[in-house]
Structure formats: C-alpha cells, structure tokens
C-alpha cells in the first residue's frame, strides 16, 4: 500500500453526487465526492456517516436543525437520522462509511449509485 494524494484523486473526476472509493479498512470505506446543489432527504437506519469537508462549505439539513460544516471540519450523522446535504457552491468531501451503507439510504432516486467506482 502506498500513500494516496487526495487532491490528485479529486482531479480524476468531475461528476457530482457520485462518490468514488479510494480505500477500505476494517469494514469501512473511504469515499471522495464532489457536491453542488441539493441531495435528497434520506437516512441510513443502521449506519453512522462521516462527512469531512476538504473544500468549500457543506450544509447538512436535519429535521430539527441545520448543520454547517466548514473546510477542515467534519460532522457525523448518527444512524437513523434523516439528513439532506446541500452545497451552494462546489464542495469536496471525504466520507467514511460502513461497507453496508446504501448511497441514498432508505430512498431510491435518480441519483442513487448502486456500486461505487474505485479510483
């Protein structure tokens, strides 16, 4: 295993809301994604989800509050909590998620990704 340069990996793709797998460890996957606009409200019944912002500002709308995640910060959405990521401008994130997680959780939408591309 060699080091992975996150910026070089981000340079390999342009599509939005379509996470790319860059690694796995201990039943977890490490994903990179570029976001812009609004995602769907969804939840992951059995998995927590970590959003780490590398570039930009991410808003995560919950049913009862709004979370703002700035560059260099992360937020963990607890399992079972409905959330909707929003990016007014392009945002680059790293996601740490269990391998069992489904992209749009309990919702099937046009943007749902069944299998993450490895880069």
Residue spans for each PLM region:
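Double-stranded beta-helix
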Residues: 2-10, 23, 88-119
